[in-house]
Swiss-Prot record:
One of its GO terms (cellular component) is cytosol. This is Translation initiation factor IF-3, chloroplastic. It comes from the Eukaryota. IF-3 binds to the 30S ribosomal subunit and shifts the equilibrium between 70S ribosomes and their 50S and 30S subunits in favor of the free subunits, thus enhancing the availability of 30S subunits on which protein synthesis initiation begins. It comes from Porphyra purpurea (Red seaweed). GO terms for biological process: ribosome disassembly.
Amino acid sequence: MLEKYKNSKKLSRDLPQINDRIKFPKVRVIDDEGEQLGIFAPEAAIQLATKQGLDLVLVSDKSDPPVCRILDYGKYKFTQEKRAREAKKKQHNSSIKEVKMRYKIEEHDYKVRINQASKFLQSGDKVKATITFRGREIQHSNLAINLLNKMAADLVTIAEIQQAPSRDGRNVIMLLSPKKVN
């Protein structure tokens, strides 16, 4: 029984507060041109809106009295959704790309890894540089740390070290993130 009540409460909260759903004793009304009309009872404000063929939409319930606007709700909803889509387009979800190598890497192979990392960083992704060891190679972890420091120095113009080179089991890992452009 209680669960059913909670769900119905949630549904009513999700619905937009327009026209008859506005349950405040007094509301501040703004017309479709942005001019303040004054403080009205919701019923009077709804009548004012219906005369113009528009809706009364609650814009801000935080202020005292709550602010309502007279506008076309369909158009308002469309513009809100359009803004949300635009904001989502501009948003870039950065992911972590990994560049793996061994501590005994040749110069050309190293340059290829640097180019890969720079492409990832320029596209806004973070780069996890990993150097793996096999067998007794783990004794040379200082060489791997030096190699990762060299990599960070080579990418200093486009990247900043987020996590310094550190041992993680049979690997040495460093995390680079793209530099923020101001």
